[in-house]
């Protein structure tokens, strides 16, 4: 038996996510600010960033994380294939409001005919953090609220795949939550997003 390690062409993670979905690829063909970038900058400004101690994360590492998220999204679509086929679940692509663009992961029509924003995340952190979303998931909640405002709904869901579960022992798991917003909550969060973008000079 001869075992030889090899690198495919194109290599991983590019083979998984493709050049258009790499973290370094532009999301939009113009200069409009992207919701995710605004929220990430807001988080850094208020000390809620998701950076790590020590050396900054590399582009290659970011792309591996992106590959993990891409895999979860595609497996999730397969698990909900009936809704995908009948057209009640879809990926909307780019949406825009007040000069800001965003790309919700999925939109779904609920039983009452209402629109639901569906956000999919892959995390290596402990699944216990899901017990307190407002503490540990400020960026994700802000992102979901932004998408909800952009598409005109108060209904949303967050589905998180935890690669190592709660780490005791490290067994994969998934957790999900329905998040119902008030119009006031969405207005306040959106106002903060737009205001931050203007202060940074990203919006006129």
Describe the predicted segments one by one.
Residues 87-196:
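Mg2+/Mn2+-dependent nuclease catalytic core
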Residues 199-201:
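C-terminal interaction segment
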Residues 1-115, 130, 138:
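Metal-dependent nuclease catalytic cores that hydrolyze phosphodiester bonds in DNA/RNA
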Residues 204:
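Beta-rich carbohydrate-recognition modules and glycan-binding surfaces
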């Amino acid at each position: 038996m001869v075992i030889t390690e090899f690198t495919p062409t194109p290599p991983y993670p590019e083979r998984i996510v493709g050049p258009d979905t790499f973290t370094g690829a532009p999301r939009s063909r113009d200069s409009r600010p992207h919701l995710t970038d605004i929220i990430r900058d807001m988080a850094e400004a208020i000390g809620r960033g998701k950076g790590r101690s020590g050396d900054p994360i590399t582009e290659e590492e970011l792309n591996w994380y992106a590959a993990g998220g891409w895999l979860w999204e595609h497996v999730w679509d397969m698990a909900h294939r009936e809704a995908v086929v009948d057209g009640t679940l879809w990926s909307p692509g780019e949406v825009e409001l007040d000069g800001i663009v965003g790309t919700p992961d999925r939109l779904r029509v609920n039983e009452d005919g209402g629109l639901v924003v569906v956000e999919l995340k892959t995390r290596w952190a402990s699944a216990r953090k899901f017990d307190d979303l407002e503490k540990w998931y400020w960026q994700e909640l802000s992102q979901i609220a932004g998408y909800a405002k952009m598409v005109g709904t108060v209904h949303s869901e967050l589905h998180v795949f935890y690669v190592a579960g709660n780490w005791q022992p490290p067994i994969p798991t998934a957790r999900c939550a329905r998040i119902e917003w008030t119009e006031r909550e969405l207005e306040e969060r959106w106002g903060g997003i737009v205001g931050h973008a203007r202060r940074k000079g990203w919006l006129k």
